[in-house]
């Protein structure tokens, strides 16, 4: 399929999945320019649109594109000016080189691999991130001397990647010749597969082991990848033994990553584990105020207060809401007020806004109720005190989430989907037979929904 055909199909699906006003405003006039190095380069007409789409709809478009073309690419939105800069950079760097040199050099790009905005100076500190910020700064000041590894976990859009970029900037500012590599577990996996396919194991190891600081994002995605875990285990060991700093991020703590080898889990726990929680009201207001100061804008405090009260989930959505309001005000030619903010954000604010339930949420509530540790839900233990709560958690996972049977099984230690079906049938039968137990399960369900 041509880029035009691919994008036509993507837009058809997107139009059915998002609100009409959002689609018409932000996506309707976009254009897929090309797919380059697993990155889909997409043209938009306005810088506000590029920023807003990159912040709010990147994952949606990524999922749709995978369904359309059969493999995963990362969508990135650019204006005409940004595309021109991108093409100029590409032309300057487009010199022939041997494949293995490409693998080695990719990633050792100094500060170019980091978002220029993501520094410690621009990080807004609040109760939910004060400790992770302090730990990250300590690591950046003295790599491999303070905490090694540093493991940062928390939900999407809370600032994990910002802190990792800030560490990279700070290290290179103090040590310009340091070799700092920022990557994701998915990129690590893809490079590993490529090295096997091209018979270039030494080039791969040179890239990932001949460095001073490794910053690896979203480590949870190496679960179920046995060979990748094996390779990362040896990479981790070599870096740690040579006193090189390792910083890891995840959406959950090591003990809750299903199908992660115990030897890797224990190494992740060698250093310091810190968690980032959603920002409180004061932090949300500070983030918005800092953003408008950076952009040299004036927005009424009442409008900022409205955004801070309505968007409570994460920083990415908070900044995305502000970007959307600015774009809406400019396009409508109207001054920003609380009323305009409510109008601009009506598609992304749901009242009441219900939190999407995860399997981890269910395991935490059930585990607390029955005194079962989170890791025991994934363990092979079959004692009734663990096995029965595990079945209850599986039952609730089917009832309260949209996850597939295999995905639920995966989150319970890689169990087969038939095990999930059996657990659901057994608990459903017990609920019918025992009114006290039925009330117990209903109470658990209420607690999960009200978290």
Curated annotation (Swiss-Prot):
SUPFAM superfamilies: P-loop containing nucleoside triphosphate hydrolases (SSF52540), TrpR-like (SSF48295)
GO BP annotations listed: DNA replication initiation; regulation of DNA replication
Chief location category: cytoplasm
Gene3D superfamilies xrefs: 1.10.1750.10, 1.10.8.60, 3.30.300.180, P-loop containing nucleotide triphosphate hydrolases
Keyword entries, A-Z: ATP-binding, Cytoplasm, DNA replication, DNA-binding, Lipid-binding, Nucleotide-binding
Stretches the record annotates as Domain III, AAA+ region: 113-329
GO cellular component terms given for this protein: cytoplasm; plasma membrane
Compartments, record wording: Cytoplasm
Segments for region (Domain II): 71-112
Binding site for ATP: 157, 159-161
CDD domains: AAA (cd00009), Bac_DnaA_C (cd06571)
Pfam families in alphabetical order: Bac_DnaA, Bac_DnaA_C, DnaA_N
Domain of life: Bacteria
GO molecular function: ATP binding; ATP hydrolysis activity; DNA replication origin binding; lipid binding
Keyword check for Cytoplasm: yes
Region spans: Domain IV, binds dsDNA: 330-451
Keyword NAD: no
Region (Domain I, interacts with DnaA modulators): 1-71
Family indicated by similarity: Belongs to the DnaA family.
Function: Plays an essential role in the initiation and regulation of chromosomal replication. ATP-DnaA binds to the origin of replication (oriC) to initiate formation of the DNA replication initiation complex once per cell cycle. Binds the DnaA box (a 9 base pair repeat at the origin) and separates the double-stranded (ds)DNA. Forms a right-handed helical filament on oriC DNA; dsDNA binds to the exterior of the filament while single-stranded (ss)DNA is stabiized in the filament's interior.
Entry's free-text remark on domains: Domain I is involved in oligomerization and binding regulators, domain II is flexibile and of varying length in different bacteria, domain III forms the AAA+ region, while domain IV binds dsDNA.
Subunit composition and interactions: Oligomerizes as a right-handed, spiral filament on DNA at oriC.
Designated name of the protein: Chromosomal replication initiator protein DnaA
Species per Swiss-Prot/TrEMBL record: Staphylococcus haemolyticus (strain JCSC1435)
């Amino acid at each position: 399929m041509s880029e035009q055909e691919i994008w036509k199909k993507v837009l058809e699906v997107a139009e059915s999945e998002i609100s009409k006003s959002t689609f018409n405003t932000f996506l309707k006039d976009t254009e897929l320019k090309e797919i380059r190095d697993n990155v889909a380069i997409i043209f938009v007409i306005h810088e506000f649109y590029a920023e807003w789409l990159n912040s709010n709809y990147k994952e949606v478009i990524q999922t749709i594109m995978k369904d359309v073309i059969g493999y995963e690419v990362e969508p990135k939105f650019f204006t005409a000016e940004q595309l021109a800069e991108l093409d100029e950079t590409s032309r300057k760097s487009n010199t022939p080189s041997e494949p293995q040199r490409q693998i080695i050099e990719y990633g050792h790009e100094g500060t170019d691999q980091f978002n220029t905005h993501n520094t410690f100076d621009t990080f807004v500190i609040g109760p939910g991130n004060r400790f992770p910020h302090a730990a990250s700064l300590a690591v950046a000041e003295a790599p491999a001397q303070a905490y090694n590894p540093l493991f940062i976990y928390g939900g999407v859009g809370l600032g994990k990647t910002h802190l990792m970029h800030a560490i990279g900037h700070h290290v290179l500012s103090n040590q310009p010749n340091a070799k700092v590599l920022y990557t994701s577990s998915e990129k690590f996996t893809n490079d590993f597969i490529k090295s096997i396919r091209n018979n270039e194991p030494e080039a791969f190891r040179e890239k990932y082991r001949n460095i001073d600081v490794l910053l690896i994002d979203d480590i949870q995605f190496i679960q179920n990848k046995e060979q990748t875990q094996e390779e990362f285990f040896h990479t981790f060991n070599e870096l740690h033994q040579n006193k090189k700093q390792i910083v890891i991020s995840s959406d959950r703590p090591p003990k809750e990553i299903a199908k992660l080898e115990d030897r890797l889990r224990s190494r992740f726990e060698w250093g310091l584990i810190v968690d980032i929680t959603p920002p409180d009201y004061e932090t949300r207001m500070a983030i918005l105020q800092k953003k408008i100061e950076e952009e040299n804008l004036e927005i009424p405090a009442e409008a900022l207060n409205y955004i801070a009260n309505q968007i409570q989930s994460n920083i990415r959505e908070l900044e995305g809401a502000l970007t959307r309001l600015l774009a809406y005000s400019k396009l409508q030619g109207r001054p920003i007020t609380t009323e305009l903010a409510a109008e601009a954000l009506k598609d992304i604010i749901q009242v009441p806004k219900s939190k999407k339930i995860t399997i981890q949420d269910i395991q935490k509530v059930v585990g607390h109720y029955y005194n079962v540790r989170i890791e025991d839900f994934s363990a092979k233990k079959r004692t009734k005190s663990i096995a029965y709560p595990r079945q209850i958690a599986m039952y609730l996972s089917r009832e309260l989430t949209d996850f597939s049977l295999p995905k639920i099984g995966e989150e319970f230690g890689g169990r087969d989907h038939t095990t999930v079906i059996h657990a659901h049938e057994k608990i459903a039968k017990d609920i019918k037979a025992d009114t006290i137990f039925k009330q117990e399960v209903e109470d658990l369900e209420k607690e999960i929904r009200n978290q």
